[in-house]
């Protein structure tokens, strides 16, 4: 099974996938941005993922995206791809999963995670290692809406199912509750598919 997990930066995808890995150690987890960074380091001398969208011309960025997709598509077994449905570039939104990419990846599921914008802002403040753009709550919500549209468009092109985990209006009763719920959802998706095989 191939699952693409998409959410805004600061949504906790890495934490979720660490929980998945604890329960299903044989699942391959690949971060699309990390694969792109390795390619961009060699070609453009980029040092940080957050520099890619600012320093690489869009036509070259597309080539890096495609090369990363080809590598990820070659992975076998259960694979979870950590990426973004849309990327903020030049004041607009660029598709993270355009047709030419999603048709190479061919995921079974695109899992979209959504949160209260305040939650995302707080998580971003706790992650000083990243060089993220500052966004207001309104901008974060607009970006989440863009993600939803892009996720469904990608699912159409990739003939994938979209699953939405919406944590808006659901405050955590304990630390990492949302991450645990999302991880359990992913684990169950994979286990159900394995049982059918």
From Swiss-Prot:
Gene3D superfamilies reported for this sequence: P-loop containing nucleotide triphosphate hydrolases
Pfam families: AAA_17 (PF13207)
Coiled coil: none
Keywords: ATP-binding, Cytoplasm, Kinase, Nucleotide-binding, Transferase
Record-level GO cellular component terms: cytoplasm
Binding-site positions, ATP: 7-15
Cellular location(s): Cytoplasm
Gene Ontology molecular functions: adenylate kinase activity; ATP binding
Catalysed reactions listed for this entry: AMP + ATP = 2 ADP
HAMAP family: Adenylate_kinase_AdkA (MF_00234)
Protein family according to the UniProt entry: Belongs to the archaeal adenylate kinase family.
Protein's name according to its UniProt entry: Adenylate kinase
Organism: Pyrobaculum aerophilum (strain ATCC 51768 / DSM 7523 / JCM 9630 / CIP 104966 / NBRC 100827 / IM2)
The encoding gene: adkA
